Amino acid sequence: MHADQNYEILIVMKVDRINCKNDQGDILDFDPYSMYQSLKGYTDIAEAEFMVKFFDLHANNDSILNIWPDVMPIKPLSIDYDKVDIYIQGGFLLLSKEAYDYLYHFLDAYGEFLKIDVNGSEMVLFNLRVFGQEDLDKCIENYAKGLRSSFKSFAFIDSDINSKLLFKSKLLDGIGLFCGEEFKQLVEVKSLNGIEFNEIN
């Protein structure tokens, strides 16, 4: 090897999509419509406009902290809800009280914490408000009967996400949550249960 030869070392950031472990489905009784019904009395926005705003909450990256009550009661759908540390539902990251106490300082700059009460148990919904910039050349759509059903491959631009702990995608309407190794390690070092990490690139 000649001394004057230059080599570029390319390091590709590993990205994981965060999913519910074993695809357990919803564990709490809420959806966009029920939450709209619960919150419409806290805003002066016209009902029809507020409904659209709430259904597009994650895609539009809106905040609802200013209309969220101190604590919102939500009923469980699963008897095992209190055994989950961290979960994904309706585009929110669901945190147990213990997971919230641990992750608060890491996630505070990335979104807002919405406190809920589930049968007397304090839990928190985290509304992520940070997007990652997709690498459109590597996001290949999968079509079924002429309609986009999913993506064959998905990727983000490394320079945009390499300093982001947690982020979402505009192409997925803000519903999918993604992370790099740092967040994954935060979860694993405390053995927080309820989610799994699936590498996308």
Residue ranges and their predicted role:
Residues 1-201:
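Phosphate/anion-contacting hairpin/loop surfaces
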